């Protein structure tokens, strides 16, 4: 049975186009995989703290030396990693904020990027350990940035996801949403056309 993990990273609880389009993409994937299980990780509702002394200390303390507080921190990270490992397909709703990802998504990445857990260093260089999965990124943007220097989001996501082993990544863009009603309509139509082709 296929498991789909949808990660919503918008800072808006309602009406975020990245979330709405990610919902549509997940529904499309379900059509092609009857009986698929869907797990939704809402990074706004279940906010993760930014890295600090406590989190870093927990990650780098040997398991047999951790305090109860550190064990709780690592358990939360393990929960997130287990979701990734259990998923066959990953859908990330990733709005562009100030040319990059939301702080919610960056915090999520910081909580799952753990040496020896989601990646490891070898004599041949780093190796991602979350392998054999298909990932989709749905990026909603107010302006038009694909292929331009202002798009620092796409290369960052490709680099990070590839670093942990997710190398099969398809991007769906809704660009120009803030450029007027006609541009927004065109952007959403283009994104939905890409979703329909999945």
UniProtKB/Swiss-Prot annotation:
> Residues that bind FMN, according to the entry?
96-99
Q: Which cofactor does it need?
A: FMN
**A GO MF term:** FMN binding
Entry-linked Gene3D superfamilies: 3.40.50.360
Which reaction equation describes what this protein catalyses? 2 a quinone + NADH + H(+) = 2 a 1,4-benzosemiquinone + NAD(+); N,N-dimethyl-1,4-phenylenediamine + anthranilate + 2 NAD(+) = 2-(4-dimethylaminophenyl)diazenylbenzoate + 2 NADH + 2 H(+)
- EC top class, in one word? oxidoreductase
Q: What functional role does this protein have? A: Quinone reductase that provides resistance to thiol-specific stress caused by electrophilic quinones. Also exhibits azoreductase activity. Catalyzes the reductive cleavage of the azo bond in aromatic azo compounds to the corresponding amines.
Family, according to the entry, reads as follows: Belongs to the azoreductase type 1 family.
Q: What is this protein called?
A: FMN-dependent NADH:quinone oxidoreductase
Which species is this UniProt entry from? Burkholderia mallei (strain ATCC 23344)
Q: Give me the gene this protein comes from.
A: azoR
